Amino acid sequence: MASSRLVTTAFWLSIVLGVLGEMRLEAQSTCPNPPNYELLRQDEDYSYLRDDACRRDPWDSLKYVRLGSRGDSFLTIGGEMREWYEGFRNAIWGVGPQDGNGYLLQRLSVYGDFHVKRRIRFFAQLTSAVEAGRNGGPRPVIDESKLFFVQAFADITAAEGKENSMVMRLGRQEFYFGSGRLVDPREGVNVRLAFDGIALIWKKAQWDVRAFAAKPVLNGTGFFDASPDPGKTFWGVYAVRPLPKIKGGNIDLYYLGLDRKQAVFDKGVGRELRHTVGT
């Protein structure tokens, strides 16, 4: 009799544990995978961490800091560090100063992404880029800028939805269009390229369209001495749509305009006004 009760109890216990296990798996399946680390960190979306059941990593507490009882306002905190060693032999065919030991390029960034409900967003990314050990010191523009805001912008969302959204972005921002062959944040060097200006981001069905007008940021080597370049203006429209019949393929349509007041040519210095249309 006792053994019969034991078997019955074990049977119902296994049923309960199985149901609880299924419920747990179902809850986990509703949580999306964490986003990949993007070249532009503002493209990472951690809003899914609003659901406490989706928090699986100790760092998730920094990726979603709840502000307010409703949870539709939150702060994301992140950062990255890059150490890059370069060494050359017979640089420029041995002409000029040579460096037999190489040099170190170090870049450290921290950022904060503040979402005020669904319509307003503030994003700021503070960066320190320094060079150590290079014969002749850091190269201008690309090697060193001790402390500066590489990005500091506000987003205003005019329309929101999976099939149709419109965002206006104001402030300092990085651009990365299409595959990055024409316009990218210049990740290869130590000091990345940013722009001060305005951008409109429109997503309709499978189209991603971005219109912008901005000035490139000219970095100094010190602290907070980055400012827009008064001699250059950059504007345009860039549209991207995936091609479903080609795996990983896209179609890009773009117009880019560039005005340089003091462009350097072989025969002198003058204004350059360039218009580029392509696909």
Predicted regions and their residues:
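Bacterial N-terminal signal peptides
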Residues: 9-21
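Residues on the lipid-exposed face of transmembrane beta-strands in outer-membrane beta-barrel proteins
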Residues: 79, 110-114, 151-156, 198-202, ...
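N-terminal secretory signal peptides that target proteins for export/translocation
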Residues: 1-8
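Short sequence motifs at beta-strands and strand-loop junctions characteristic
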Residues: 71, 100-104, 143-148, 190-192, ...
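Transmembrane beta-strands of outer-membrane beta-barrel pores
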Residues: 81-89, 126-132, 172-176, 204-206, ...
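Surface-exposed loop and membrane-interface regions of Gram-negative outer-membrane beta-barrel proteins
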Residues: 87-106, 116-166, 181-184, 222, ...
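Signature for the C-terminal beta-barrel architecture of outer-membrane proteins
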Residues: 162-168, 181-279
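N-terminal periplasmic/intermembrane-space "pro-region" immediately following the signal or transit peptide
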Residues: 21-100, 111, 117, 139-141
